[in-house]
Structure formats: C-alpha cells, structure tokens
Amino acid sequence: PIGQIASKIGRKRTIQCGIILLAVCFASGYVLTTTFSSINAIMFVVFALVGLAWAAINVNSLPMVVEMCKGSDLGKFTGYYYTASMAAQVVTPIVAGTLMRKIDYRVLFPYAALFVALSFVTMLFVHHGDAKAEAKKGLEAFEEMDD
C-alpha cells in the first residue's frame, strides 16, 4: 500500500507525510505518558500509527537513493545510506539511554520528535529520487482520454 501511495503522490511527499505522522505520534506519546500513570489503550493505536509512518519512510528511502545515482555509483551510495542509518542506530541508544537515566524516561518522546523534525528539514533539501512515470504506449495512451 505505501508503494502505491508513493507512486501517486511521490516518494518525497510520502516520506514527508510519514515524518509528520511520526512527529505527531511522538508528541501524542509524550502527552499520554505524562498525563496517565499507566499505559492507555490509545497508546496501542499510536504505536500502530508509528509503524505506518515508519513504513512510509523506510520503504521509500532506499529506492530514492537508487533512483538518484548512476549504475556505477549504486554500491557506493547504498553504502552511504546504510552507513548513515546504522550509525544512527548505534549512537541514539547511547544518547537516549543516557538522557533517560539522567533525566527521566519521558524524555524519549521529545528526543525522538526532535530528530524526526530534523529529518523533515533534511528532506526539504531533497530534489531528486522520485520514480519517473513510464510513457504509455499504444492503446494504453488513450485510456486516460475516457475520463
């Protein structure tokens, strides 16, 4: 489903929508964890939406990288992509864990929201990587004329 959405509105816009949804979910998580003393049932919905948002981001990221590079550079840019994402997965548990130990576990949602907001800013600078629509041939070209 996410791939179909991306083919209609574009990968970049799909990723940006995923980032916005992720930020809203993290803000909701912060509000819910500071408002209620136990896990509220709505948190399950919030975390399901987090999964949807993450899918919108993750499913489209590598294809954007692949679309932006020439065939001879594919391995190099795929390596950059995975190095950046794995480095974040190494660093953030250390930083977030330290913050949670020094401050409180509730700092996790604002921490996540901050970096999600920064990722939105970086996506504003992306100008390439959307799939190019294939030109229709033969009778397929006339299908849209019936609408």
Give the predicted meaning of each segment.
Residues 8-20:
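Cytoplasmic membrane-interface "Motif A"-like loop-to-helix N-cap segments
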Residues 40-56:
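Hydrophobic core of transmembrane alpha-helices in multi-pass small-molecule transporters
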